[in-house]
Amino acid sequence: MLAHLNSLLVSAKLVFSVGGAREGAKLLSFDRQVAEIVMTKQDVSMVGFGRRTSVHAAWQWVQTHCETLSSEISSLETAAGRVLAEDIMSDCNVPGFARAMMDGFAALATDIGGATDFSPVQLKLVGEAWPGQPINRAVQQGEAVQVMTGAPMPAGADVVVPVEMAERLEQPGKPDETVRVSASLPAGKHVGNIGEDIAVGQKVLPRGRRLRPQDLGVLSSIGFPQVPVVKRPKVRLCLTGNELLPAGSHPEKYRITDANSPLLRPLIQRDGGDCLFDGITPDDPDAILEVLQQPADVILVSGGSSVGAEDYAPQLIQKWGELPIHGISMR
């Protein structure tokens, strides 16, 4: 559920309430009332849920009442898991040059047409090209250049013969070396063309995408040291209950240890939110109201959200705002 809020802005506070297994999850809000759901202003305590809303209708309400958060700039080092605020368009080709896709020999396809194991073609070796180190001459008819994978293609060459299909020959007493080619390959074979991976003007990543580590590699390859991302929603955790002991405490008679905040806090962080949590809130309406009125984009209430005598959260929201949804039909 939290993942769906990662790229949303709550125009007014949203309050989500997490109940037990029997109760399911409850969705509460200070914001405008959804048209399909009608609630009276009666006290909801000790009378049962007036109606249970379907999960689909609840999500529709959330999507209707949320807008995109404002954006900020993030460096690539901190952008993993963030949500893109804009489409990313490439202003360059990747690669920006034709390159060899195999270790072998760059040559002219017309020179090796018809070459076989039984009838090889010999070419004059005129140099070498390495990644980042091109050869400063063009390949002429009857010539070849040894290339490594990723090396810029020499001018004039239009095919790379893999080392498995060629043999470099050194002839004693002769300064010139030759290459014996035993395969016929078409022009363009084993050659990476300009813009083959990413072309100028291409939409590389869409707005709203949650960035993965591999996306950051793509962004770096097109020269983006930083990217516009949606601000993280501030999610305030309101954990209520007089019976609760701090997380990690040993259970005592008639009291239980907080097991929800250790679960919810990392879930909020995992799904893109910044968790705000000031500790356990007692079952006191004034104390709960104080938490609900603190600045936040989303408030997640755990406990005190059903229809019991001390379930104050629904009453407070109904009194100080609106309660469009109270009770969701789910297990």
Description of each model-found segment:
Residues 40-53, 106-282:
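Short, glycine/charged-enriched hinge/interface segments at domain edges or termini
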Residues 19-20, 24, 104:
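Residue-identity detector for glycine
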Residues 95-98, 193-194, 328:
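Short Gly/Pro-enriched turn/cap motifs at secondary-structure boundaries
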